[in-house]
């Protein structure tokens, strides 16, 4: 018998009025970075099942694919689904000849927004993040253009991803920032020094990705053996032989003292039933989805209401 669906809590993200599901569905791994793209029809069914289960905060970016993840999500949003969700996407990163480029100039911001509209099939984005900060362009200039998009009704709320505390303050002075997205886990805790206290002070919500260390804290070193050549984690320094042994020792230590169970308790409060084709979704929606496997995880929100 399929497990009964459990109500997903809803929270205020930040202090500007945005309400989202406490668990979010990061869609990146459906199309990019975590191995080959997954079958489109299965991913659309998965998204629909998540929404039906109450996970309505959907996260993507124009760089995932690039572009293909937004196209996928756009198809999933058809048929009245758009009205049921809080849609977040990002701009500011592109790849040219294999080289990453960061953009924050006003013309790029506006062009990127229009491009996301077309791929997603929408005329308004609920939460629009600057994916990475362009150090060549003052943050005040970038946020100024985003503020215009808010005033024009094209986006509702502004977010930043991977921004410093000082950048967050400067941005917030131009227009209220609703959310900051960052990596936050047992081995990524630098944000606790300045960024998270700054967000608390300013009433900015935190959207944490990879709370289980990109799957390491749920699987340990054996995770690396299962990664395909197309999985970007295979090339991350933390998973290389010179670091893996030490990280494996840390994993065993936290596993013995129960920290991994506590991490599961933090990120997995929602039991989900059976999706299409009777494939069961795990209880956990950990870091940024990765096909919703417990070692690969969803977006977790922490709300600060100021």
Swiss-Prot record:
InterPro entries xrefs: AKR, Aldo-Keto_reductase, NADP_OxRdtase_dom, NADP_OxRdtase_dom_sf
Binding residue positions for substrate: 131
Site positions per UniProt: Lowers pKa of active site Tyr: 90
Active site: 64 (proton donor)
Residues that bind NADP(+): 210-220
Alphabetic keyword roster: NADP, Oxidoreductase
Domain of life: Eukaryota
Region described as Disordered: 272-306
Pfam families per UniProt: Aldo_ket_red
Induction: By N-(aminocarbonyl)-2-chlorobenzenesulfonamide (2-CBSU).
GO terms of molecular function: aldo-keto reductase (NADPH) activity
Gene Ontology annotations for the cellular component aspect, listed alphabetically: cytoplasm
Tissue specificity note: Leaves and roots.
Compositionally biased intervals (Basic residues): 276-289
UniProt record similarity statement: Belongs to the aldo/keto reductase family. Aldo/keto reductase 2 subfamily.
Record's protein name: IN2-2 protein
Species of the source: Zea mays
Gene designation per UniProt: IN2-2
């Amino acid at each position: 018998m399929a497990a009964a669906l459990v109500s997903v809590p809803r929270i205020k993200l930040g202090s500007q009025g945005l309400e989202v599901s406490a668990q979010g569905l990061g869609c990146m791994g459906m199309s990019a970075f975590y191995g080959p793209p997954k079958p489109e029809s299965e991913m659309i069914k998965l998204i629909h099942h998540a929404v039906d289960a109450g996970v309505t905060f959907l996260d993507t970016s124009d760089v995932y694919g690039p572009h293909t993840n937004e196209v996928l999500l756009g198809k999933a949003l058809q048929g009245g689904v758009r009205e049921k969700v809080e849609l977040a996407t990002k701009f500011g990163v592109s790849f040219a000849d294999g080289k990453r480029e960061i953009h924050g100039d006003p013309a790029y911001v506006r062009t990127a927004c229009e491009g996301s509209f077309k791929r997603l099939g929408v005329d308004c984005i609920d939460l629009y993040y600057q994916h990475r900060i362009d150090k060549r362009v003052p943050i005040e200039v970038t946020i100024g253009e985003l503020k215009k998009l808010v005033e024009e009704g094209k986006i509702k709320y502004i977010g930043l991803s991977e921004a410093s505390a000082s950048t967050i303050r400067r941005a917030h002075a131009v227009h209220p920032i609703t959310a900051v997205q960052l990596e936050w886990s047992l081995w990524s805790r630098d944000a606790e020094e300045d960024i998270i206290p700054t967000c608390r002070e300013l009433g900015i919500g935190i959207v944490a990705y990879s709370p289980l260390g990109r799957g390491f804290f749920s699987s340990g070193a054996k995770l690396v053996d299962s990664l395909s050549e197309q999985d970007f984690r295979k090339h991350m320094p933390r998973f290389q032989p010179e670091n893996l042994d030490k990280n494996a020792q840390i994993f065993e230590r936290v596993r013995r003292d129960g920290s991994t169970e506590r991490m599961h308790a933090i990120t997995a409060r929602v039991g989900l039933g059976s999706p299409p084709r009777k494939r069961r979704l795990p209880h956990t929606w950990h870091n940024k989805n990765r096909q919703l496997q417990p070692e690969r995880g969803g977006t977790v929100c922490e709300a600060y209401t100021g």
